[in-house]
Amino acid sequence: MTLSARNQLKGTVKEIQLGGVMAHIGVRVGDNLIESVITRRSAEEMALKKGDAVKVVIKSTEVMLQKD
């Protein structure tokens, strides 16, 4: 998958908190834990689980996740 966003950081899913509508995903990038808030549906469609390798995509207005 090719993205136009240039701020892409490789990390590992460390925390998943599923709510009724939203999901909080904690991703370890080096010594840092970055949290992304995405829809629960997106988290389920990506089949995210602890230990998954993901990319954190940071734009000026949002933080997104990509799983290859």
Describe each region flagged by the PLM.
Residues 1-68:
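Non-catalytic connector elements of ABC transporters
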